[in-house]
């Protein structure tokens, strides 16, 4: 068997190869900049600011602009003024966005702090720190990326000064002066992500220098680089396993070049990689992105080049160009500013030649909505790791920046979602990264590969067959074992199918991996194939591989997993490299840099002698860290930082969002001259030997000495599983059946499922110790319910592995369902089955039980008895012929589990006696009526079984044979059966084998002449290049299939469809039935409309009548005189059946292999259901004369290629007709011919004469609620649970309002923010702080009279606005008169709604507003019709005239309304008109004269109406509104709050309850049942109400639509008649009718025949049941039969009789 490894694609895989650039919109440009273009540096930025040298003051000023202030910069921008000569260099601090350092030609260096409150104050002239004046001009200023107060400056004396800024002002001193440069220093770079202790510089003397500034002032390495006279610039690329230096310069021919150097191997004068970039003359600067290993090159010119860096290559991805607008400078913004929601990986500022600054974003296209953590690792938080004094004191201290996650709140990471759902495995990601970095390394384990990383095998292996040394009595032997690495453990199994390991060990408990030294290998080749795994406790596992390559792969893989799983503790060097760390793998002498770095470590780390190693093994775990040096960090006082926003170093230790900083000296790295953990190549300088436990081996020779294959000894961990609670999917108590010799026992254990493993413990308290046993669920075969296993109460189920059966018992049915659901997701076959819903990880069972499994069990399994389950595996008691001379028969229990047949002694057995894999069975033969035999592929007997004797009612033997045969067919791998080479599928298909492009299949090749003979191309058919003939055949079962394109296919009994693209012919035989013709015509018409968009012409032809269509006969290759077949007849066709077979091609994600299995088999008499097709698979549908390849949307490319191979093999079968073609279809792009192959495909033709399958999914009729139940709903008051979080505008709420106009959002005038117009729609953005972050709510407000277009526009513009915002955002739809409380709170006591549109608004026109509401938040003014009839004594009204504003207080209006009315009137009083307050009854003539234009003083709902009522009105009762409807099939009563006039629906009955009155507004289209029920409910409610209702104090009135009484309308906000039908105007108000008068008509049950013929019908009569109102005597006279005889007549016939008698 070939060992399984991580596959490497032929095409170079890259996460960023499709990165593209995008310039921001013009409105986000920064313009009107006055830049001193003569300055050496032109542009720098922080997260909040950007700076540029200003031309003001002769270049001695530095202009600062906020990144949030887009647009035109003021003519006099904010500047830093403090130098007398032009500024030559400047740099922002890494720890404070508002701190910047400047250097000038006046030889001064100053540190400034820009005020955070804004840049509108006076210019900044007082620096924070002024350093001592230099002797020569300052050329550069730099901050350390991790160390606080460490500052550097370079001058024209060609030195680099390092300052400690802890002591402020002139006391700041140079603590180190780096010398050795011979010309101007052009750039400086720190190894930010690999320790922060090395410094590289580039100089105009064409040399690069490396410094260890804490050890010496002179360079530890100097190397010549680019030959160009202009010099070069550099940066470090030292994240994600890289440790490189990138330099960008030019050669003598002015060709710009990119070099990659290994800082550990600089003794070679040649770079690792050299790439030509461009011939432009400008100097390019490199910018490194630590998250994606990309390097951007840019400067003065016309673009930005970007490369992806690998260990041995730099891949050019692209160039960002900007047309004719050239740039003067660029700067990379901090990583934390990018928008991860749109996959923006980097953002630059670009200073153009037109003195404007543009933002340029680089984006990586990803479709998923998940957080793409693989390209967005934690970024620097902006806080220091340590300070200057501590860093200089400890020369072994390595520091990296503090990091914080970039994941937005509420978004899942791509690593938190399964691969089946579009997620990624972090483990695989890291291993693939390690694989890329290892390719090309020296040594036998490297695996090779070309320079581009486009080929070669991966050096990593995850599972495979090896041999292990097994101790024997006389000698040891090597036996086959199956080794596998899973997560953080290595497991050794007896074979590949075993579910329980022989031994296992955490990878961190492996001390090292040894191989035998090749130089000492004198005993033969066998030693070169072996490696030893030595554990920390001294235990050793000796393994042997089949090849050296496999041995090397295992050694490197184990070490890679060890490095990747190192805990992030006090020894972490970098959060990016904390999971793995690469050391030097090249067998050359160490560079001076390495010697300097490790000169002290060489004394602390030495290779232990054999005696020392033996002592260490004897000590075991007593002193596991004996070789680990202790931290020697001195204790010093932390000085206060003047630069950092967070000066407290100790506070950072408890900062949960940051990576923990610590000195690396706590666990120092041994010298890099040791062997790499990822390479087993022997170096020339080190050969380590160890002694091992002496054992007797099968070879007489002595093994050569072992060579250590690692560089560090890991810290031992607890040998327990160390399961994290967050990784646990399910856990709980289960009872396991333990068989015994005499009786069985039931043992309770604590089971845990985590990361594909099932662990068992004695109890929960021992969960952190070693488990009793570990079962790999991916090796398990089946998990299903059982019965009659346990004798105690519970719900049993069974987990089956290849060599064991585990019987378990849960306490509840729901608990068992949850366990089965989890177990089945991890089974052996789950990798290719339909994915289940992902369970939420939880620590308790209650949280897991979300949807119990369907089960019809109704008892609690007392005595182990359950009811019959819906799906029971094939199992039972059989007799098996035992092997032996006498061939005896023995009883056994046989169960078919998945694709395996388990034979056990009895049902309670836990170990099967025999396991038969059905994939190895070639024949199941029935020997006798109750005996059958299984044969293998060699026709050898596998097993004989005997069943009970068959009876007339039951044949058990046939049942077993049919069940086993079906399972055997499903187990066959079609790929192997057809002899398809799976490796060929992984390579690109040749063009001759490519399926042609068709419709939605644009990613395939264009069809060639050969393609059209083998494939059906839907596009070619549409264009007329291909033609097909379709037959519609059958009588009882009409079927559609494709036949040969020839006149010989025609039959006089059938219809045929000739699809010629632009023309579709329908030819009907002379004896074709009408049903057959109808289906053919319908099918052809569907092709025309659905597939051709109605552009094809439909031509109908009948045999013997329309024979002059020469085109039809020409296409078929014949003429109308050709004889037409008369056989087979429709009856004979019905006896025919065409076999249909569906194969499913799946990808087993667990084994990374393809599987093609039989999914369905039958004939066209019983078609499969569409649900068999799953989007994650590809299906090959074989219909004998047609072959379809159906491609699921979520299937992989290799699945699609394999399906094509399977289809081609099927097409090439000998018994296949030569005109069979293959059609490729994508999901949702199926053609009509394919849909006809399924029974229930949407859009299938309904014409069929066969009996349809009876489904059990018929909706059951609902039971009507009792009147008392509906009435009780009205007694429960409505409670508004909306929590208030908004802040009104007047109190500081941040609100922005837009109005929708011409499909765009237009800024609403700010002074009208609380005023809206009923014919407009709006978007209101509210911004607030949530958890110290900005959050947003977008309300899109739909005016009551706004158009549908405006309402739709507001919705999609809200989505656009949401996408442009940063932070949490919620979208809320707000409808007029039903506004939510938080929206109203924004405009508290200010909100006004005017009639009409804003553009037509005339503030001088007289208008009337109704002020209504329950409290200050709910109160608002709504404009009503300008008529005195709209006044309401219950509320306040505002009358606005050009001369004066009147506030009219209704006699019974609320105080809150009266107070708010004044505030509202002042709000829209734009003309400063006087305001007069009037009370009802004391109005002036001037007030009433304002209404003269609309009829003057009219009747309105006044105090007299209330006082004259016989029933007193309650003014404290809140009106309530209910809707009574039977839309759901039964009568329901629901409360609406808030309610409005728009809730009145003519198809329902609406109930308005104001306590003193209850109005029933009966819609004209409400059903009879609803009307009657609503009246009965109200009357019952009054009798049972505890809210103050009673028959004496509550009057129930019926209101008619469009004739509502004035009292009814007065309780609605701003009642209007604008939406009334024109035939109902002018209004006629009618008083309400007492409900008792109406209800008595509905309760009347008997009417005469003459009364039922009246038009209109009597009130209360149900027009659909007129026959039920006749008494028995009249009924017999009218219908001439009794009611009993009437009910026996079918319903459809009864309707016809009723129509004849006009009772309908």
UniProtKB/Swiss-Prot annotation:
Ranges for the WD repeats: 82-122, 133-173, 180-221, 225-271
Molecular function (GO) terms for this protein are: actin filament binding; phosphatidylinositol-4,5-bisphosphate binding
Q: In which residue ranges is the amino acid composition biased (Low complexity)?
A: 613-636, 651-701, 709-721
Domain HP per the UniProt entry, residue ranges: 1641-1704
State the compartments where it is located.
Membrane; Cytoplasm, Cytoskeleton
Start and end residues of each PH domain: 459-563, 727-828, 871-969
Task: Give the span(s) annotated as Disordered.
Answer: 439-460, 606-721, 848-877
Gly residues bias: where? Answer: 442-456
Main subcellular localisation = membrane
Q: Where are the transmembrane segments?
A: none
Q: What GO cellular component is one of the record's annotations?
A: cytoplasm
Q: Which residues form the Gelsolin-like repeats?
A: 1025-1119, 1138-1241, 1293-1390, 1404-1494, 1520-1615
PROSITE patterns assigned: HP (PS51089), PH_DOMAIN (PS50003), WD_REPEATS_1 (PS00678), WD_REPEATS_2 (PS50082), WD_REPEATS_REGION (PS50294)
Q: Please give the name of this protein.
A: Villidin
From what organism does this protein derive? Answer: Dictyostelium discoideum
Report the gene name.
vilA
